[in-house]
Structures are given as structure tokens and as C-alpha cells.
Amino acid sequence: MITVALAKGALLKDSVARFAAAGLDFSAVLDKDNRQLMVPTPCGRARALLVRNGDVPTYVSYGQAQLGVVGFDVLKEHQLPVAQLVDLGFGGCRMAVAVQESSGYTRAADLPAHCRVASKFTQCAREYFDALDLPVELVHLNGSVELGPITGMSEAIVDLVATGRTLRENGLIAIEDLFHSTARLVGHPLSVRLDNGPLASIVDAIRAATPVGSFS
């Protein structure tokens, strides 16, 4: 039986729809009354593991799931050994540096050396500022990173931005993008290499169901 790690939250509905195109019905995970974390398909060919977004690469890299759907931002942050198979196009957002609108900063290089930068994505932030050759003190936060500049704890933040509404409502502005992120179909490398057909057929069907240029 093929095991697929699906992230709870914003990516779940589109993930289920994409697997449906491959003949796998995971719609039971969308039932608001569902409390099961391991949900088989009616056909018995596969089962879904409902996990946190950040845990998808872990389940896939350790082989507890042969396939998974996760945001590119998570892959960049955790850097676990998984095979990136298909850019699914949905869940589009960008990783950005943001500051208070009144700060006067217009690009990341304007930030003072050794200033504090708050983020949930400290690995991504570290790589970015290292590439700029700008030493900063990274402050790891698990939520509401916008409060960093508002309270004066940090000069800037690095966070995911979709519409930018949260930034605007808190007096912040994005000044530079690190990268664009979309949902990715990932696989356990050894399982993909040793596959004798079942995994490839699912991956091919999902790839065929992904419209070119429809990324959002």
C-alpha cells in the first residue's frame, strides 16, 4: 500500500483534488468530523497520513510515506533528503524581507549590520543574509513575527507573504523577496528509484493534471 503524507491546512483541499486526478480518493480527510490521522482510500491502494506541514518532509525522508505534498518554503527550511517530483503550482506565496513602512528601508542591504531579524524560517533567512554578506542576529519565533518590528524587538522579519494584507494591517512593507514558493509533490528517494510502476503512474497522472502556467 502506498502511503502519502498530506499537510493539514491551506494545501489540503488542492492536494486531495490533485490525487483524485491520479485515481486516489482521499476526500475523507476533508470531512470536518474526521478525527483519523491515517485514512485509507476506498480502493485500498493507498492511505493518507494527516500531518503538520513542517513534518511532511520528515515522514517522506524516513520512508514512512513514499509520497507527500509540502510547500517549497518548508523544503528550503528543513533541507531533508527527499526527491522533488512535481511543482504542483498551488499554494503560491513568496518568502520576503519586511520592515516597518516608516523605517525608510527600501532593500535588505539597507539594514544595519548586526540588527535583529525575526523569523520562523531562520535557515532560509541565514542563507539569504549570508549571501548578502550582511551579518544579522536571527530571532526564531513560532508565530506572529510581525510583532518583532512593531514591539522594537527586531528591525525586520523574514516571512511568507501571500496577499500582503497582514503586513499592511500591521504597518509593514515587503522590501525584498527571497524566493517564490508553491506546493511540491515529493517522494522518498529510494522508493522512487526502486519503484516498479505504481509510484510512477501516480506521479505521471499528477504531473499531467497540473496545468502549465497556472501557478498561484
From Swiss-Prot:
Gene3D superfamilies: Periplasmic binding protein-like II
Subunit and partners: Heteromultimer composed of HisG and HisZ subunits.
CDD domains: PBP2_HisGs
Keywords assigned by UniProt, alphabetized: Amino-acid biosynthesis, ATP-binding, Cytoplasm, Glycosyltransferase, Histidine biosynthesis, Nucleotide-binding, Transferase
A cellular component annotation (GO) from this entry: cytoplasm
One Pfam family recorded for the sequence: HisG
EC numbers on record: 2.4.2.17
Biological function: Catalyzes the condensation of ATP and 5-phosphoribose 1-diphosphate to form N'-(5'-phosphoribosyl)-ATP (PR-ATP). Has a crucial role in the pathway because the rate of histidine biosynthesis seems to be controlled primarily by regulation of HisG enzymatic activity.
Highest taxon listed in the record's lineage: Bacteria
Top class in the EC scheme: transferase
Glycosyltransferase as UniProt keyword: yes
One of the GO biological process terms: L-histidine biosynthetic process
Subcellular localization(s) per the UniProt record: Cytoplasm
PANTHER family assigned: ATP PHOSPHORIBOSYLTRANSFERASE, ATP PHOSPHORIBOSYLTRANSFERASE ATP-PRTASE
The protein's name in its UniProt record: ATP phosphoribosyltransferase
Catalytic activities: 1-(5-phospho-beta-D-ribosyl)-ATP + diphosphate = 5-phospho-alpha-D-ribose 1-diphosphate + ATP
InterPro entries with a match to the protein in the record: ATP_PRibTrfase_cat (IPR013820), ATP_PRibTrfase_CS (IPR018198), ATP_PRibTrfase_HisG (IPR001348), ATP_PRibTrfase_HisG_short (IPR024893)
Record pathway: Amino-acid biosynthesis; L-histidine biosynthesis; L-histidine from 5-phospho-alpha-D-ribose 1-diphosphate: step 1/9
Organism of derivation: Synechococcus sp. (strain CC9605)
Domain notes: Lacks the C-terminal regulatory region which is replaced by HisZ.
One annotated GO molecular function: ATP binding
